[in-house]
Amino acid sequence: MLKNSGSKHSNSKESHSNSSSGIFQNLKRLANSNATNSNTGSPTYASQQQHSPVGNEVSTSPASSSSFRKLNAPSRSTSTEARPLNKKSTLNTQNLSQYMNGKLSGDVPVSSQHARSHSMQSKYSYSKRNSSQASNKLTRQHTGQSHSASSLLSQGSLTNLSKFTTPDGKIYLEMPSDPYEVEVLFEDIMYKRNIFQSLSEDKQEALMGYSIEKKWLIVKQDLQNELKKMRANTTSSSTASRTSMASDHHPILTANSSLSSPKSVLMTSASSPTSTVYSNSLNHSTTLSSVGTSTSKGKKLVSGSLKKQPSLNNIYRGGAENNTSASTLPGDRTNRPPIHYVQRILADKLTSDEMKDLWVTLRTEQLDWVDAFIDHQGHIAMANVLMNSIYKTAPRENLTKELLEKENSFFKCFRVLSMLSQGLYEFSTHRLMTDTVAEGLFSTKLATRKMATEIFVCMLEKKNKSRFEAVLTSLDKKFRIGQNLHMIQNFKKMPQYFSHLTLESHLKIIQAWLFAVEQTLDGRGKMGSLVGASDEFKNGGGENAILEYCQWTMVFINHLCSCSDNINQRMLLRTKLENCGILRIMNKIKLLDYDKVIDQIELYDNNKLDDFNVKLEANNKAFNVDLHDPLSLLKNLWDICKGTENEKLLVSLVQHLFLSSSKLIEENQNSSKLTKQLKLMDSLVTNVSVASTSDEETNMNMAIQRLYDAMQTDEVARRAILESRALTKKLEEIQAERDSLSEKLSKAEHGLVGQLEDELHERDRILAKNQRVMQQLEAELEELKKKHLLEKHQQEVELRKMLTILNSRPEESFNKNEGTRGMNSSLNSSEKANIQKVLQDGLSRAKKDYKDDSKKFGMTLQPNKRLKMLRMQMENIENEARQLEMTNFAEFEKDRLEPPIHIKKPKVKKMKNKDRKPLVKPQEADVNKLNDLRRALAEIQMESNDISKFNVEERVNELFNEKKSLALKRLKELETKYKGFGIDFNVDEIMDSPKKNTGDVETEEDANYASLDPKTYQKKLDEINRITDQLLDIQTQTEHEIQVEEDGESDLSSSSSDDESEEIYQDASPTQELRSEHSELSSGSGPGSFLDALSQKYGTGQNVTASAAFGENNNGSGIGPLHSKVEKTFMNRLRKSTVSSAPYLEELTQKVNKVEPYEQNEDEGLDKKSLPENSTASAASAFDKAEKDMRQHVENGKQGRVVNHEEDKTADFSAVSKLNNTDGAEDLSTQSSVLSSQPPPPPPPPPPVPAKLFGESLEKEKKSEDDTVKQETTGDSPAPPPPPPPPPPPPMALFGKPKGETPPPPPLPSVLSSSTDGVIPPAPPMMPASQIKSAVTSPLLPQSPSLFEKYPRPHKKLKQLHWEKLDCTDNSIWGTGKAEKFADDLYEKGVLADLEKAFAAREIKSLASKRKEDLQKITFLSRDISQQFGINLHMYSSLSVADLVKKILNCDRDFLQTPSVVEFLSKSEIIEVSVNLARNYAPYSTDWEGVRNLEDAKPPEKDPNDLQRADQIYLQLMVNLESYWGSRMRALTVVTSYEREYNELLAKLRKVDKAVSALQESDNLRNVFNVILAVGNFMNDTSKQAQGFKLSTLQRLTFIKDTTNSMTFLNYVEKIVRLNYPSFNDFLSELEPVLDVVKVSIEQLVNDCKDFSQSIVNVERSVEIGNLSDSSKFHPLDKVLIKTLPVLPEARKKGDLLEDEVKLTIMEFESLMHTYGEDSGDKFAKISFFKKFADFINEYKKAQAQNLAAEEEERLYIKHKKIVEEQQKRAQEKEKQKENSNSPSSEGNEEDEAEDRRAVMDKLLEQLKNAGPAKSDPSSARKRALVRKKYLSEKDNAPQLLNDLDTEEGSILYSPEAMDPTADTVIHAESPTPLATRGVMNTSEDLPSPSKTSALEDQEEISDRARMLLKELRGSDTPVKQNSILDEHLEKLRARKERSIGEASTGNRLSFK
């Protein structure tokens, strides 16, 4: 309600009592009428109640005029019906008295001033009151409510529920079968929920685009919610109705209250302590209820009656017809109606929970609920409560916590309402609301003050005069301090602020507000903490709450001071605020150091200065002074100062200014100095005049200091310039971004989504490709990991092998006492221990590394077979060693012997060769005994070797080596002692005896082998010692000689031992040959070498090639037989032993061939040459000899296995063992074949053809062509020279152009004109131009002075008529020459004049004149460049230079869309300005650097218009903008072409990807290749067989042909695949993408992609740090950055995408190349990769087509052959039958006749099928076409031609060569079917006679049938004539009857013999 609404329209002057009594009477009547008419309503309402799904629980009413658009408004009620109260009237005394006294007449509606504006849209529209009742009783009627209101139980929901209600009252929510019903229900919900009203059209379309199922789900959920709420409210309906009836009859006012004046109605009087409030619900049907409140003085407060809206309340009450009290409310708080809260507020009984519920309800409920709350004036009720309880009360009352909470809760509701337009309207309409909010500005609670400030900010958000006035009035209102509880509390707590005031003093709201703000800031603690802070600060939320409050306060101040349009009002407000201390408050706010608040303070200052400036300008305008006119300014100043003391000062000031300026002007100094001086003076005057202080001297000093600070250094100026440039660039970027966004916005509905989807698809494709590449790389990484682990396995194998080799070698030692040393082949104990330790450490380290790598890689590999065997073998050896440790060697260890020495067999050998002394007989037994002992020692050594083979532990080696060395030492001593006695120590004798008794020896060895007790060996050693003592005496005589020989041998042994040590350290795995050599050279003993060989063969798994072959120092006496015997014995022992043999031994014995030993003579030869004086030299020579022998054996094919040093390190033993003689040879041949099978390098290009070969002819041809050109060009010349006598007319082809088409050419060079010799003969003299023209010009133009001179001529050139000219007109229709007469006649009639206008050619005179004027201008460009400008810019020829330059600089759309122009202006030869051109154009050029406007540019020294057009364009663009023109055009080129180039490159990449994917996924292609490989390996020899082939092999498949040269190898492959594996042929369709990518060069594609990305990067760098970064150098009109910057991010994005994609593509491509065995590093291989596949596919298809054609021909041939053979067979059978039949009957003849007819029919059909004309070549087809044409043209002469032909024997074949005697052979040669007979060509005379026709009736029937069948078989195009066919058939039948029955027919027939 508006303020003072009751006073201005009150016409009654009744007393207060009368008014009061009248109100009560009306209220009683209204209550009675409500009680009686509560259930009455319109018929529509009643009917709707009947159809309600729940009876009468929910009442609905028809929609009003503003209701939902889909519902029809009910008809207006008649005058006799009861009308509701007007919504816009207030329930005051005047309105009630009008109802009582019947002052409302007829249909005149009642309105009040305080009604809402009609412009405000409300959810509820009510009909105006129009009552014509005779009585004064008030009736109530339900009015139509808005169906668009989003109430919880609206009419729409109830109507929708009724659709799903069954007759029995149950509700079944099932989806309707009609989708339209679901659409309607969904749309109703959207409107009911107010969703469509708050969404844009596109979002509405998106909602309506939901599927039917989704829409029904939403509808069903809404209906279920409505049903749930309806059922919850049904239970309280009866109680609600009863309590409603009770409340209607309850007396509203129980105490008398007087109304002093109508001002008390619905408003609060500011002067009286008693407040009377009336709350009007503004609804149709009203019910009054009031709550009286008494003040502290005992006065009763009259509360206005409150109207009631039954329909709305009933909706929210679940169907109750009347309102209920709080006690009868249901428990569900969400369904409380607005009237409930209003009643509770009026009764001041609203609890804190209900306040919170009200606040939540206002925020969360639909708008109709809030509208209903506002319509019930709940906000006014809350304002009244606050006014009565806090803001206008007695001083003795205290401000309790409940009151503060109530105030805070009410202000929360106020803030929610202020967010709505209805709430803002109510706040601005009722002064009570603004007063209440203003009172809350200085509340003691910070949150309340903040909310009050926010409410005022919402009111002043938009410039609204009424709201501004309402706020301003409330702020300017005065109040008494003692009436406001907040001020009373502040007065008591902070008396220092109120020292000059009392409780009776009055303050303005604005003062109290600013006081509250300041004391809030003063309550802030130290350094923003709670130390020293006030209670309000501590309880108000801390620092953040203070900051937000200050921010809202400053926002409110700025809104308040800038809301008014009146500058005086704004300045007055600021002045008042500053007087109240706002500046002091701002200073305190600045201490908070909050940016947002400081910004608001700066905004306040800026607005203040702006208003001040406007005010000054307005004051100056009052003096009629033009501030922009200096004369007016000086005149006014002079008028003011004239006649005063200021006159001299003003004159002095002007004089000084003039003198200082004129001095600089006279000195002709630079204008910049004058600018600086004027700037200095202006700055000084500005700072002095604007300063606000009163001290003039201070102002001057400050002004000067400020000026100096601003201009103190050049650095500041430069920085300012740079900042300006940066800001300018940023502005351009922002503008460009704005344009780009606007363009995107314009495209939002036209493809932007599609573009984004395409980009998303591109990224998805790149991601998929990246995933594929990652998978490939992961697979490669897994393979590398496996290889690494396998290498670890191999390393372990090598270490174990070396450790086994080292452990298996016997230990050698020295005998220092006797001074002899054995030849040492192995290391001493310490070195061996060190090596073993190193190997064991390496083995453990390898195991650890393998475990670590396996753990790191997350994968484990099973060891290979060899490693498993080695591990198992070493474990077995360790187990054997443990068993040996348990053996008792105590007796043997007590006699510790010296380290053993090797037996020197070479000495024995030498002794054998010398002359030996005969042995003494008694000594023979000793010798035999010694031999037996040696055999026993050999067995002992064998057993010891067997043990050492499996000995790994060092301790076990030492035990057995000591025993073995002791025996060997004793044996060596014996040999040494008896060496001089001539004893024969030949090993042959020793080895023969074991051969004889092999079985016995083996038995003994088996017995000895079973025992390892050292006592047995000790007994044998004792016997040896005894024999040795006997033989020592005999040895003395040869001791000296033996000593000398021992010294030589020891030297050799030591040297070889040293060499052996070095070799072992250098190479841990020597070759097998070197091992055997080491054993033979170092040990020198048979058993020792055998131990080494045995250890190497069975201990390490290797085969010894020649264990005893290299006997450099001996011939292996006793070793050969002993070797085989011991090996056999050892193998027997090994089989019987518990230690299982290695599984690979059998494999080795199967794969490794046995090595034949060297022959005896070779060994003897070696022995004879052994042991020279120099032992080292002899050893070296022995090695050389061994190597030579090995090579010789390999060459002779005797050596089975040769392994070099490198192969032993790397090759696998099984693989090496396969190399025999044949394999070696095949391997060599394979290698050579592989080398030869590689594709040869491409042949070099053929040399260029020598120029001398064709030089003269080419030169002559060129000269002749030039001559022709000269003739053509000279033919166009307008003024030829007078001609000589004319030669014969030249060919017409030499002269082509008419006169005037081209400008006159330059004269032809003499060289060309004189070159007439050569290919063409000398030409005649040149023809006159007139005759040359006559070849092509119109006959209207004269060809010679004598011809066509009488024809009329046109005044201007016309379009030419091109015709074929007839030169010779004699004896033709043109000879009369009548055309000239017709021309004269037409000319006289004006027809030719009209023709001249109609066919006028385009005028070129203007262009010629322009060109002539242009030629007069200056040009510096070359002719070529000028012509290029004219050609490339021809589309802009109509534009002037300035317009063209402007178009180019502005980057117009048509310019950017012309790629040719952009490309031309980007050419390097165009944009590069040479030094000479720059110097020439310097006077015409303009410097645009730093120029922002065209007017500011310095004009050039010379006028550029003096230059030609091309020069002007070149000057304006390339010269003036040379500093950045190149970069500019590059940027524009990228911007205009990047999308096209990106799409082209992307398309090529897509093709490559498809091809790569096809090749990767095509298993059929791989299968075809495997078929080719299989067939090729079958055809090739073993040396040329391969595991795969390169792609270049595919090209050679067509080179190989079969024996008949009819089919290639590829044809056979295709046939094999098609017949046996037909599915493999699918690779032809799978590899279709490969054919599309053949023409794409991979290298070029990669380079193009790199160039594309690099060009974009270059442009970005140019914009960032390059030539385009400084926009001050640009032309003022240049908009290159605006066009470039928006596009660069998108271009860079595409460049990055393309770069990533090409990288992935190339990775996949190179991986594919590796897959097919190609080298990715070979450029030629990359280029030809896809081409090889494409060629193969094409050749394969061609081969397939050839095969199919050949098979089809073969099939047809076989078919025809079968048919003919069957016919021949039947004919032969018939002949036999006829021959057998002697007397055929007539019936039989008839049957034979029928059979003959059928046979003739069959043969005839066969002949007709095969007798077709053969296909001829196209040349014969052309000949036939020509002949056919000639034949048609001369059809009349055809019969004569046919009659003239001379035919032979009635031939039925028509041929032009019929008269040729050789034609018969030609015909027979060319015809596929031999001719049977030759008859005469049929004519009309040759037809059979009628008598013959009757006789041959059957034959004619057969021929007709044959002819019809022939047409069906061959179609209508078969060139067969009916007569010839008929004659042929008749002749055959005649011949058949004449011949005998048994003869065969002579028709056309194929025969196969």
UniProtKB/Swiss-Prot annotation:
<feature type="coiled-coil region">
    <location>
        <begin position="712"/>
        <end position="807"/>
    </location>
</feature>
<dbReference type="Pfam" id="PF06371">
    <property type="entry name" value="Drf_GBD"/>
</dbReference>
<feature type="region of interest" description="Disordered">
    <location>
        <begin position="1872"/>
        <end position="1899"/>
    </location>
</feature>
<dbReference type="GO" id="GO:0042802">
    <property type="term" value="F:identical protein binding"/>
</dbReference>
<keyword id="KW-0963">Cytoplasm</keyword>
<dbReference type="GO" id="GO:0000131">
    <property type="term" value="C:incipient cellular bud site"/>
</dbReference>
<feature type="compositionally biased region" description="Pro residues">
    <location>
        <begin position="1278"/>
        <end position="1292"/>
    </location>
</feature>
<feature type="compositionally biased region" description="Polar residues">
    <location>
        <begin position="1880"/>
        <end position="1896"/>
    </location>
</feature>
<dbReference type="GO" id="GO:0051016">
    <property type="term" value="P:barbed-end actin filament capping"/>
</dbReference>
<dbReference type="GO" id="GO:0051017">
    <property type="term" value="P:actin filament bundle assembly"/>
</dbReference>
<dbReference type="InterPro" id="IPR015425">
    <property type="entry name" value="FH2_Formin"/>
</dbReference>
<comment type="subunit">
    <text>Homodimer, and possibly also homotetramer. Interacts with PFY1 via the FH1 domain and with actin via the FH2 domain.</text>
</comment>
<dbReference type="GO" id="GO:0030010">
    <property type="term" value="P:establishment of cell polarity"/>
</dbReference>
<feature type="compositionally biased region" description="Polar residues">
    <location>
        <begin position="110"/>
        <end position="143"/>
    </location>
</feature>
<feature type="region of interest" description="Disordered">
    <location>
        <begin position="230"/>
        <end position="258"/>
    </location>
</feature>
<feature type="modified residue" description="Phosphoserine">
    <location>
        <position position="1338"/>
    </location>
</feature>
<keyword id="KW-0472">Membrane</keyword>
<dbReference type="InterPro" id="IPR010472">
    <property type="entry name" value="FH3_dom"/>
</dbReference>
<dbReference type="InterPro" id="IPR042201">
    <property type="entry name" value="FH2_Formin_sf"/>
</dbReference>
<feature type="coiled-coil region">
    <location>
        <begin position="864"/>
        <end position="894"/>
    </location>
</feature>
<feature type="compositionally biased region" description="Polar residues">
    <location>
        <begin position="41"/>
        <end position="100"/>
    </location>
</feature>
<feature type="compositionally biased region" description="Low complexity">
    <location>
        <begin position="31"/>
        <end position="40"/>
    </location>
</feature>
<dbReference type="GO" id="GO:0007118">
    <property type="term" value="P:budding cell apical bud growth"/>
</dbReference>
<dbReference type="GO" id="GO:0070649">
    <property type="term" value="P:formin-nucleated actin cable assembly"/>
</dbReference>
<keyword id="KW-0009">Actin-binding</keyword>
<dbReference type="GO" id="GO:0032956">
    <property type="term" value="P:regulation of actin cytoskeleton organization"/>
</dbReference>
<feature type="compositionally biased region" description="Basic and acidic residues">
    <location>
        <begin position="1184"/>
        <end position="1211"/>
    </location>
</feature>
<dbReference type="GO" id="GO:0110085">
    <property type="term" value="C:mitotic actomyosin contractile ring"/>
</dbReference>
<feature type="modified residue" description="Phosphoserine">
    <location>
        <position position="1344"/>
    </location>
</feature>
<feature type="modified residue" description="Phosphoserine">
    <location>
        <position position="325"/>
    </location>
</feature>
<feature type="modified residue" description="Phosphoserine">
    <location>
        <position position="1085"/>
    </location>
</feature>
<feature type="region of interest" description="Disordered">
    <location>
        <begin position="1768"/>
        <end position="1797"/>
    </location>
</feature>
<feature type="compositionally biased region" description="Basic residues">
    <location>
        <begin position="1821"/>
        <end position="1830"/>
    </location>
</feature>
<dbReference type="GO" id="GO:0005884">
    <property type="term" value="C:actin filament"/>
</dbReference>
<dbReference type="GO" id="GO:0030950">
    <property type="term" value="P:establishment or maintenance of actin cytoskeleton polarity"/>
</dbReference>
<feature type="coiled-coil region">
    <location>
        <begin position="928"/>
        <end position="981"/>
    </location>
</feature>
<keyword id="KW-1003">Cell membrane</keyword>
<dbReference type="Pfam" id="PF02181">
    <property type="entry name" value="FH2"/>
</dbReference>
<keyword id="KW-0597">Phosphoprotein</keyword>
<feature type="coiled-coil region">
    <location>
        <begin position="1732"/>
        <end position="1811"/>
    </location>
</feature>
<feature type="modified residue" description="Phosphoserine">
    <location>
        <position position="311"/>
    </location>
</feature>
<feature type="modified residue" description="Phosphothreonine">
    <location>
        <position position="1918"/>
    </location>
</feature>
